[in-house]
Amino acid sequence: LLPLAQSEIETHAANWIDSAFAGRILKVDQPALGNDLVERVLRGGYPEAIARPSARRRIAWARQYIDAIIQRDVREVAGIEKLDQLPRFLRALAQTAGQMCNYTQLGGQVGLDGKTAARYVGVFEQMYLLKRIDVWARNRLNRVVKTSKLQFIDSGLLAALLDVNMEEVQQDRTRFGNVLETFVFGELLKHTTTADGDYRLMYYRDADTFAVDVVLENAAGQLVGVEAKAAASARAGD
């Protein structure tokens, strides 16, 4: 199952995606800013993590949860007996969260061939740890042949894998950007499951490296682009 969305945690029923395609951007009465935003992103959406009273205990739970999935669920679902490579491979995937998939390169970091790496990514996808998203293109066939992007689903789990914590973010926000993008992607993914409309999540990147983090497409082919920025303010170039 997917983690909780922020709207579920805060008990707000409105769906952001439905509203955006209807031309209405939802207003937030008390937007999360500064350390409050960082705290939400690092916490993620799993009820068990949210219930922990401290960041240290949330991180400990996240690591135990990941270990349990690898040791129990992966063995049962995928029939993979040699599990020793999976924790290292998952951490390698965490380092490339939000980037395009190159299975040969990813697998090579932990001694796996490209075919095995792709299979393991598929297993993690079944476990709702991450998701591969296609690139958006006007020609639908191009979506098949172009490289997918790898996104983790829960920002709290990603932060635990990367050892990103509040103290680091307060001093240096460099690595927080990828965790924030994961948070935004995860929220949009959850909203697609509760929306009235039918939506696809993709990303955009052209030959000039112009990119959009998330492209939402409805059944009519209409688009909404979403870009996540960790900076305190937006610039015209963004």
Each language-model region and where it sits:
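Short amphipathic alpha-helical interaction segments
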Residues: 111-126
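Amphipathic coiled-coil/heptad-repeat helices and related helical stalk/stem segments
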Residues: 33, 117, 235-238
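A generic structural signal for residues located within well-ordered alpha-helices
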Residues: 57, 61, 81-84, 119, ...
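A short acidic, leucine-rich amphipathic alpha-helix
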Residues: 104-108
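Interdomain motor-coupling "hinge/lid" segment immediately C-terminal to the ATP-binding subdomain
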Residues: 1-95, 99
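Generic structural marker for isolated residues within well-ordered, non-membrane alpha-helices
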Residues: 6, 103, 185
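A cross-kingdom feature that marks ATP-driven nucleic-acid transaction machinery
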Residues: 122-238
